[in-house]
């Protein structure tokens, strides 16, 4: 085969260049190697096959190129009317498909080495024309410009697609798709570990989320006719627009109102101030975050579901054990905070019969009423003065009480094995009863009697 090392002296893909290898209409070039400063020009009606372009060499294409390999800064420029079939883009290789150009069956192995959607436009595949049946592997990236369109793209883990134009029939097998302002994605299939992100001004239609796939719709983004199958994750807020079906039936997030949303396996719904959510199902791995001034009613918390809220929100529903709970009007009743959950009690508000199972309970003042229970892994953080006139119970396992002060005529009861650590806290209670386990004080003051039973440790 021929080796070409001239033709780029006046810049990449410049019409001012006159050197290099020219393949004219009816001509064919086979097994050519294009190296540094080299250029192969395939004119309309010409064909190049099995070309290797490396070390900064380039191929300018108005005709047909088949099975081109781009290595180490090798570049391929597909002009209007040109077609590239079966191109392989290896590390630091670069393919540009200009308006009217077509690339089919491209394999992209470069462009995303800097991480997901990093600012890297010097390698990978850039689509201003049309790209069909592209495979994007680990470290591969396809960028679809506003004038570009991609069809039937397959993206594996570690690869990604950035959409400013149109993307149709994309399949995410662990890969990522980012749809930007003005971009459109249709018929995207999100399988395990795949991730589709619809940014502000971006749109998606007919996305399907399968087990452990994730659709994220940012504020100002829109996704319509979504199919969320069991185990698929939806991440969004009430500032986005999302419609579709899930295992409960039809769901929607429109104009600040969410209805019938299912959250699991990394799914999350943020209910913003002044917005509402109804009939939300929060299962294992799902998170419902209700901001101060937001409202969520008929919430169903499953095992492993996470609730984030403060006493300025309005939330009501049932816990994983079937017990009704409520937050509203400065009062929280019967909350159960599982691992990852968090509730903040604001000054002047009251929390009654709160159970913390590995979650975080923060009291910025306010009052603890009824029985407050800390189970294994629970954290109660005090800020300022919090009043407890009833019972704070620490059961089996380890728990942490930290910061601020706990005052009032209530009691602290430690039962079951494990350690209650009190750190940087002032305890002023009627009594501290150490029935089982260990009480550890770190930079804390206890201004009450501590009654320690035999076999306990202080």
Where would I find each of the regions flagged by the language model?
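Beta-strand-rich extracellular passenger or scaffold domains
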Residues: 1-458
């Amino acid at each position: 085969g021929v080796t070409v090392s001239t033709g780029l002296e006046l810049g990449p893909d410049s019409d001012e260049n006159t050197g290099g290898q020219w393949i004219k209409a009816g001509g064919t070039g086979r097994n050519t190697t294009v190296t540094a400063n080299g250029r192969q020009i395939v004119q309309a009606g010409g064909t190049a096959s099995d070309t290797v372009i490396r070390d900064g060499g380039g191929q300018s294409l108005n005709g047909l190129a088949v099975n081109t390999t781009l290595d180490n800064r090798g570049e391929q420029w597909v002009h209007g009317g040109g077609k590239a079939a079966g191109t392989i883009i290896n590390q630091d290789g670069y393919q540009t498909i200009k308006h009217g150009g077509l690339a089919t069956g491209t394999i992209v192995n470069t462009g995303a080495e800097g991480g997901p959607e990093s600012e890297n436009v010097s390698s990978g595949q850039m689509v201003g024309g049309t790209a069909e049946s592209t495979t994007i592997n680990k470290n591969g990236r396809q960028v679809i410009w506003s004038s570009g369109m991609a069809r039937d793209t397959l993206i594996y883990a570690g690869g990604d697609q950035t959409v400013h134009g149109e993307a149709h029939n994309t399949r995410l097998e662990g890969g990522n798709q980012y749809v930007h302002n003005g971009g459109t994605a249709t018929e995207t299939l999100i399988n395990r570990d795949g991730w589709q992100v619809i940014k502000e001004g971006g749109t998606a239609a007919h996305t399907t989320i399968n087990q452990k796939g994730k659709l994220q719709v940012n504020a100002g983004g829109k996704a319509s006719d979504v199919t969320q199958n069991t185990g698929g994750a939806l991440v969004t807020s009430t500032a986005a627009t999302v419609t579709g079906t899930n295992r409960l039936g039809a769901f929607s997030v429109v104009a600040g109102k969410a209805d019938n949303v299912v959250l699991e396996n990394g799914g999350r719904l943020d209910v913003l101030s002044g917005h509402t959510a109804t009939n939300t199902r929060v299962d294992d791995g799902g998170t419902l975050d209700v901001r101060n001034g937001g409202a969520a009613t008929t919430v169903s918390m499953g095992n492993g579901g996470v609730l984030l809220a403060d006493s300025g929100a309005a939330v009501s529903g049932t816990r994983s054990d079937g017990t009704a709970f409520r937050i509203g009007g400065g009062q929280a009743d019967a909350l159960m905070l599982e691992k990852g959950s968090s509730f903040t009690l604001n000054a002047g508000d009251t929390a009654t019969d709160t159970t913390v199972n590995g979650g975080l309970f923060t009291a910025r003042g306010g009052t603890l009423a009824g029985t407050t229970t800390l189970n294994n892994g629970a954290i109660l953080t005090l800020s300022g003065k919090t009043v407890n006139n009833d019972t704070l119970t620490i059961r089996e396992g380890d728990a942490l009480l930290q910061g601020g002060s706990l005052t009032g005529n209530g009691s602290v009861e430690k039962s079951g094995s494990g350690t209650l650590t009190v750190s940087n806290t002032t305890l002023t209670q009627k009594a501290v009863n150490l029935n089982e386990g260990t009480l550890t004080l770190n930079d804390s003051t206890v201004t009450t009697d501590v009654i320690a039973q035999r076999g306990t440790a202080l």
